[in-house]
Amino acid sequence: MSRVCQVTGKRPTVGNNRSHAKNATRRRFLPNLQSHRFWVEGEKRFVTLRLTPKGMRIIDKLGIEAVLADIRARGEKV
């Protein structure tokens, strides 16, 4: 399963670890992904999404129905 937020599209980014001596080694910064079940009243079922806390705030603001419509418009299966 890929480490991508289904709502915001946030993915891992790359950067450097920096030691005290300023040595740089490559590393990945992973998004804070959470698996969360949402009740969809229109479909009378739960939908599990893998998303970041920002994605959860977007769902709080817009509603799960609107966010699911946007995800399905992108072609993702939910």
UniProtKB/Swiss-Prot annotation:
The gene is rpmB. The keyword Ribonucleoprotein applies. GO terms for cellular component: cytosolic large ribosomal subunit. One of its GO terms (molecular function) is structural constituent of ribosome. Belongs to the bacterial ribosomal protein bL28 family. It comes from the Bacteria. This is Large ribosomal subunit protein bL28. Keywords: Ribonucleoprotein, Ribosomal protein. One of its GO terms (biological process) is translation. Pfam families: Ribosomal_L28 (PF00830). The lineage of its organism: Bacteria, Pseudomonadati, Pseudomonadota, Gammaproteobacteria, Aeromonadales. Residues 1-25 are annotated as: Disordered. The keyword Ribosomal protein applies.
